[in-house]
Amino acid sequence: PKLKYSRDSYSSPQMIMTIQAPDEASFEEFVNKNKQVIVDFFTKAEMNRQINLLKKEYSSVIAAKVGSMFGCDLRIPAGFERYKQGKDFLWTSQDRPGSEVSLNFVVYSYPYTDKNTFTRDYFIHKRDSVMKLNIPGSLEGQYMATDSNYVNVKEFSVKGEYAFEARGLWYMENDMMGGPFVSHARVDRPNGRVVVVEAFVYAPKDKKRD
């Protein structure tokens, strides 16, 4: 079997992957062996598409706020204007009209001490403490927490610096709300801190993608 791809053959932006195999059995075997490569290919293509879109149109309000608070350049889709600010914490959200869907971005930071700062357990502990303080529910005793049974982490590097990704599920303590989240944490060595950017969704009736 052979795998090849082409860019912008019939439209733009567009990525096409073609797999050639002599028969169905060898095709199935090839896909099973290379499924992660295939998924990563389209995931990266979609990420690049979103990045190019955000270069043209983004929330200038949130970009300016993140820049002043954290010294970071963060661009999120236009339409995110309202926000809640705390100590080393910023939360912006957008509710979809006519639905229960709520899209959210959070940025927060905390001191970088050593490599243990990036362990799975430490991340969950730190996330829970930050969210409990800054994202309470509508009633007393309600606050956001992490479902520790469903947190997957991945280490990688950005421009030679250590970075950490966590994907999992959040829930509202003493409430029925919950949904998926994705967090990216990076070391900011000049300022001796870790900066976390997170997206989380509340969409009880809709399917969620990566």
Where are these regions (language model features)?
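Solvent-exposed alpha-helical segments and adjacent loops
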Residues: 1-60
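Signature of long, low-cysteine stretches enriched in small and polar/charged residues
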Residues: 2-19, 25, 132-191, 206
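Extracytoplasmic
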Residues: 12, 67-69, 75-77, 161, ...
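Short, well-ordered beta-strand elements
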Residues: 14-26, 105-109, 192-202
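Surface-exposed amphipathic alpha-helical segments
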Residues: 28-52, 74, 80, 193-210
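N-terminal "mature-domain start" segment
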Residues: 55-84
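Secretory pathway targeting signatures of secreted, lumenal, and periplasmic proteins
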Residues: 77-136, 171
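A short, polar/proline- and glycine-enriched secondary-structure boundary/capping micro-motif
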Residues: 101-104, 177, 206-209
